[in-house]
Amino acid sequence: MKRTFQPSNLVRARRHGFRARMATKGGRLVLNARRAKGRKKLSA
């Protein structure tokens, strides 16, 4: 059986990276929430 997690740094960055977050309104809300919470790392 093929495992569900097949790691790829490129796909990770494209789907969950900073620029992907900034591209949508919802993503910007995510970043704002993480900034407000004081997260050291905002995105992948």
Curated annotation (Swiss-Prot):
Alphabetically ordered keywords of this record: Ribonucleoprotein, Ribosomal protein
One Gene Ontology molecular-function label: structural constituent of ribosome
GO biological process terms on file: translation
Disulfides per UniProt: none
GO cellular component, one term: ribonucleoprotein complex
Organism superkingdom: Bacteria
Keyword Ribosomal protein among record annotations: yes
PANTHER family: LARGE RIBOSOMAL SUBUNIT PROTEIN BL34M, MITOCHONDRIAL RIBOSOMAL PROTEIN 34 FAMILY MEMBER
Family recorded in the similarity comment: Belongs to the bacterial ribosomal protein bL34 family.
Record's protein name: Large ribosomal subunit protein bL34
Protein source organism: Cereibacter sphaeroides (strain ATCC 17023 / DSM 158 / JCM 6121 / CCUG 31486 / LMG 2827 / NBRC 12203 / NCIMB 8253 / ATH 2.4.1.) (Rhodobacter sphaeroides)
Record gene name: rpmH
